[in-house]
Every structure is written in C-alpha cells, then in structure tokens.
C-alpha cells in the first residue's frame, strides 16, 4: 500500500543552478512523501521492509496516462527538479532551466515526476532516517544500494501513479545511468530513454576519485563509524574535502582557467606570495566555500552510499563486458547527449553506448555539444543543447498526439499496480 503526505522540501539547489526561477517556471511546488509498505528486495540480498520516497510533480497526467516523464537526479540533487520550493522561495529546482511551461521538457504537455532516491538525505528513506527495528537512525547499518535498486523503487512509484509506460525516462550523469538501467530492467515501461553526460560504467580513475572522497569522510574523527548522529556531530571536514574533490571533476580545465586562473585571493604588497598554507589563490577559496557549504546540508553516509552505487553500475558486467548484449532487452528509442569538455564522463563513453545500440538496431539520436563547462554543462543554459532536447520532446509529443496542452487530470492510483519489479 502507498500513502502520500506533504513534506517540507529538503533539497537545496546545487551550485550550477540559476539563482532565480527561469521565465515560465512551474511556480511554487510542494513535495509529497509517499510510503511503501511492501518489502523491497535489494541487490545486496538485504531488503527494506518499508520506505518512503519524496516526490514532486509538474504538469498534468492525461486521461490515458501516456504523457508521464520521469526525471532521475545526479549525486547531490533531489526530487526538487523545477520551480520554487514552498518552504523556501529562494530554493530553485536544480533543472529549472530544462523543465517547465514552454521549456525543453514542456509541462504544458508532459506530466513530469521528480523523485529523491532511496538512501538520499532530502526526504526519502536513507541513513539519517529512523530504523524501525532500533528506534535510532540507520547510520552505517543502512543497506548499500545500486542503481538497479533505485529503478525498482521508482517502478513502484510509477505503479502508484497508475503509469504503465513512461513517455520518457531522462537523467544527467548518475541520472543518465538510471535512465539507461530503466531501459534494460523495465524495457516495456520506457518509450524513450534520454541519457545526458553519462557513462555505461565508471572508469578506474572515477572509482579512484570516489574512493579518495570516501576516505576523507571515513577518516574524519567525527565520523564515528557512520553513527555520528548518536554523537550529535557531523564529519564536516571530511565531507567538505570530498565535495572539493568532486567539484574539481565537474569543471573543465579551461573553465577553471577562465574563472580563476592563477589569481591570488589577497596578495601581499606588490602581489607577493604570503608564503603560508592558508588560501593563496582564488580557486582555493572557491573550493573551500563549496566544500563548507555542501557539508552544511548533505549527509556523509548518503555520500558514501551514492558514490558506491556509482562504482557498482556496470550493466555489461553480467554479459562478459558486451554492452550491446546488455542493452539487447531495451525497447526504447534513445537520445544521448555529451559535452566536449566533460572529462568526468567524456563523449567517448556516450559514443560507446551509441555504438552498442546501433549494433542492436535500436533507434538512437546522438548529439555532442561543444561547450566549455565540463561535466556541469548538462545543468546549464546552452541554446544548442536545449534545442536538441526540445526537438526530441517535440517528436515525442507528436507521437503521442500532444500538440495541445494536456487536459483533464488523471488522479493517482490509490494502490500500486504491482508489488515487484517492473511489471505494470
């Protein structure tokens, strides 16, 4: 059984989102917390007996329930995809420039769902939630999750809304991995799969970045083995360093050079160095600021959990490394977008997915955008990038006969249509 209740929004906007809502915003939005009481089996062999998902929706679900789009979030984002949070008008959705009336993903035509993943810290059940077996926060005892676990939880959310098949599942970065997993795991439930700035698996270098970030957190004296809640403390130093490491990988070398170069923060007289170990350069000040800000709102155990889910994602692992064979179950049409200066998930990784899809005869559209902003480009305004996404959704709208805005709300189903997996 599922039960929706309103909850305060807990998802602050990441650094790359705009400071104010874009024209054509969906306006003020209030999230819901939807409870699931059917146990969710996990890839680890464990299960969650019950759990809650924080959700926001935009637009209107049409009578046939055919115009739904699921937006999957990246590492530090949340269900707050678009609009202004009801409890904080300064909290703008992390993809507000993409989702809304008249925007590339047009909420005048599509019913858009944003969901906070299990294990996160913005409302859905996660390490900071109360473990019903103990009456205390889960902490380190919260199960390790995979991208596939998230997809199974999201499929139950689709059941809650009575959605048998999504018009599209869309995501950038880790969100793109979820979209790809949807196409493999629940092929009959995805008409279009939109994968942006993503990869079919993490490289050794990327796993290395994640491990260094995790070690920074775990070795913080305030971590207390993951049970820092009981000690009324937070491993802020480790979490701050983890964010600094991650933030470097989200920006391109050229972008950092243009933003900061070798500009000194507060040089000594005549521009001399100060010959110390405090902040000397502007880039150091920026990274410290980003790290400290992040450590004030993100949960350290969630950071460990999500980076490990990133590490584990590898759909071709079960097919001897043959990505085409791993993608063979997919029935969706695909759009892939990459960015020229993204060195975290470079264009070659998207092209690898494209080649595998073409080998299978899957319909695929691919765009490589020449943009200077690195991995974070998928969050930013870029006319060429947005034109590609807009054009693709125009095609979906034509296929569904959505030339006019959706009319007549279809109420969400009171009970899930299925209890397990992806069967509608």
From Swiss-Prot:
Record site: Important for acyl-CoA specificity: 344
Any Pfam family matching the protein: Abhydrolase_1
EC code: 2.3.1.46
AB hydrolase-1 domain location: 67-381
Pathway participation: Amino-acid biosynthesis; L-methionine biosynthesis via de novo pathway; O-succinyl-L-homoserine from L-homoserine: step 1/1
GO biological process: homoserine metabolic process; methionine biosynthetic process
One cellular-component annotation, GO: cytoplasm
Keywords: Acyltransferase, Amino-acid biosynthesis, Cytoplasm, Methionine biosynthesis, Transferase
Highest taxon in the source lineage: Bacteria
InterPro entries tied to this protein: AB_hydrolase_1, AB_hydrolase_fold, HAT_MetX-like
UniProt keyword Transferase present: yes
Free-text function comment from the UniProt entry: Transfers a succinyl group from succinyl-CoA to L-homoserine, forming succinyl-L-homoserine. In vitro, also has serine succinyl transferase activity.
Family statement drawn from the similarity comment of this UniProt entry: Belongs to the AB hydrolase superfamily. MetX family.
Protein name as catalogued: Homoserine O-succinyltransferase
Encoding gene per record: metXS
């Amino acid at each position: 059984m599922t039960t929706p209740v309103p909850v305060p929004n807990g998802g602050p906007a990441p650094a790359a989102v705009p400071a104010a809502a874009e024209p054509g915003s969906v306006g003020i939005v209030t999230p819901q917390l939807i409870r699931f009481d059917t146990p969710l089996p996990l890839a680890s062999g464990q299960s969650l007996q019950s759990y809650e998902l924080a959700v926001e929706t935009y637009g209107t679900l049409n009578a046939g329930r055919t115009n739904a789009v699921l937006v999957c979030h990246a590492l530090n984002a949340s269900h707050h995809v678009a609009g202004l949070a009801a409890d904080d008008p300064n909290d703008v959705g992390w993809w507000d420039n993409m989702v809304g009336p008249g925007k590339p993903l047009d909420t005048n035509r599509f019913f858009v769902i944003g969901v906070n993943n299990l294990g996160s810290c913005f409302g859905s059940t996660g390490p900071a939630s109360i473990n019903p077996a103990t009456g205390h926060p889960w902490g380190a005892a919260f199960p390790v999750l995979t991208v596939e676990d998230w997809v199974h939880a999201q499929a139950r959310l689709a059941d809650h809304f009575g959605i048998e098949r999504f018009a599209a599942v869309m995501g950038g970065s880790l969100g793109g991995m979820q979209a790809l997993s949807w196409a493999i795991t629940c092929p009959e439930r995805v008409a279009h799969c939109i994968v942006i700035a993503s990869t079919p698996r993490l490289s050794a270098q990327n796993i290395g970045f994640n491990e260094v970030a995790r070690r920074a957190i775990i070795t913080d004296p305030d971590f207390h083995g993951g049970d820092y809640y009981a000690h009324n403390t937070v491993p802020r130093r480790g979490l701050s360093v983890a964010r600094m490491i991650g933030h470097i990988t989200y920006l391109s070398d050229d972008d950092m050079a243009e933003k900061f170069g070798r500009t000194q923060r507060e040089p000594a007289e005549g521009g001399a160095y100060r010959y110390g170990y405090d902040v000397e350069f502007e880039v150091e000040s920026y990274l410290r600021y980003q790290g400290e800000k992040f450590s004030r709102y993100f949960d350290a155990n969630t950071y460990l959990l999500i980076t490990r889910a990133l590490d584990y994602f590898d759909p071709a692992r079960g097919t001897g490394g043959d990505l085409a064979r791993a993608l063979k179950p997919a029935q969706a049409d695909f759009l892939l977008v990459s960015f020229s200066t993204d060195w975290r998930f470079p264009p070659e990784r998207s092209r690898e997915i494209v080649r595998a899809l073409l080998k299978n005869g899957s319909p695929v559209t691919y765009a490589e955008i020449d943009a200077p902003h690195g991995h974070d480009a998928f969050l930013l305004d870029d006319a060429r990038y947005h034109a590609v996404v807009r054009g693709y959704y125009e095609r979906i709208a034509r296929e569904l006969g959505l030339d006019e805005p959706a009319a007549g709300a279809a109420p969400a189903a009171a009970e899930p249509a299925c209890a397990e997996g992806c069967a509608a």
